[in-house]
Amino acid sequence: MYKFAIFLRKDAQPNFFRNIILSTLNNSYFDKYVLCSAFFQENKFSTSSEIISAVNSTRTVNIDIYGLYRGTWNKQFNQFCSNLKNYYQNSSCSTNFYKFKPNSHAKIFIARKKGLPLISIIGSSNLSAGAFADRTSKERWNQECDVVIWDDSDSSSKKIIENMLENIPGELKSFIYISNYDQTYISSDISCLDKINKLENLMKNNADIYPV
């Protein structure tokens, strides 16, 4: 059964978006990740360092990267992709890089096991510092709103979400919305699994291979 949660970031901590992604990347149960962001940052904050720290190079895993909304971020996106390629090039971890075609601005994360999408995030958050960095309330952070979808019948996925929900302060619980996915409400002929697969195919069709 698929469930979904809507997280409105009310303060710098806890950063639900960051915590779910890193917990999922750090879990060797998953064998494929899709990271789609308008911006990847490589300066004082390094998105690639966060990914590399979470995904051990000894794992057999595939990582697909989609990005580069604006040309002004080309240098940082190229550096991000180069860092990942160089780190994983002699490992069993494979990386694939894609550049958005014009007008694409999606922010999507998908974790798969044997082809099945088990945890997904569709949101407003990019993988840049304002949304993804581990920051305090005294530092600049972005107020974002993200939708998390997971297969609650999968024990590993369920545990990641449960662990995250257990650490939510009481004053923030009113900013979190959780529900079961109701397939009979709309588009009943398309399952949640199929919708996520269609979403990834749409991203791939609206992107070009990015040479690194």
List where the protein language model places each region.
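PLD/PLD-like phosphodiesterase catalytic module centered on the HKD motif
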Residues: 1-212
